[in-house]
Amino acid sequence: VSSDLTRFGIGVSYARSLDEFRAAITPRTRLIYVESPSNPLLRCVDLAGIGELGRRQGLVTVVDNTFATPVNQSPLQLGFDIVLHSGTKYLNGHSDMNCGAAIGLAELMRRIRETAMNLGGSLDAHACYQMERGLKTLALRMRQHNANATALAAFLQEHPAVAQVNYPGLPGHPDHAVASRQMRGFGGMLSFELRDPRQVNQVLCRFQVVTPALSLGGLESLICVPAQTSHVKLSATERASLGIRDGLMRVSVGIEAVEDLIGDFSSALEAGRRSATQKRRSSRPATVRK
């Protein structure tokens, strides 16, 4: 946002809480854009509060609803003007096409559609078929994503190798109360932080069911390390300011049997711990006794 919009003379300011959004509004402000839950820390914002703030100030409000999906969250009913989705993810659900979607007020959609048509943003017929196929099972898939992610988050929260779990469905999540008010389910995305960040790569290569990959929202479970992938272009200081540390791992929880998923995480975390321990021992200088 900062690097692209500023090239066109559009200023950007950042906020996290409703009070910070109020304070950030100036006479030049035209639009409020939020992501809830956010990537990769799964933070949630008060959508109803921001929707009302936008109406009072005469601002367009936009939310990225990709992580939640329409099954779990309805921002238009909470006062937002435009809802965005990466249709590549949960809406399609099969990891075999690319598209995006904007849903909202008729006048705004007319303008967006006209611009999209002028710039060539139209899906081909086969991609439309793939999207329609995915939408037919969206509600069914999301129920399983929700259930599996809830169970996996609870397991990880109790694991000794894990320092923190970020999932809005957990009572200890900082935005659990907000998420409970505005979400019908807490989604299939979570992230967790290892106590020892040096174990990240050892854990990553030990999975048998889960696939190390950057995408999300498909039938299969995927895991990635944001510091090495989505946020790799940021400096370590910039990542730390966002709460993205080297030991953070993001999971797109699929619809596999939950017992298989939990077993895979249990094995990978233990194998990663053993591998890291062996590496530390082998790196110690040898001693010779006479």
Please name every model-derived segment.
Residues 1-161, 166:
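Conserved PLP-enzyme active-site core in the AAT-like
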Residues 2, 6, 12, 19, ...:
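PLP-dependent enzyme catalytic core of the Aspartate aminotransferase-like
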Residues 18, 142, 197-200, 258:
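Residues at or immediately preceding the N-termini of alpha-helices
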Residues 108, 152, 199, 257, ...:
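Short phosphate-engaging motifs
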Residues 112, 199-203, 261-265:
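Hydrophobic side chains in well-ordered alpha-helices
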Residues 120, 207-217, 268-276:
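A common structural junction motif
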Residues 162-249, 253:
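Conserved C-terminal alpha-helix-loop-beta "cap" of PLP-dependent enzymes
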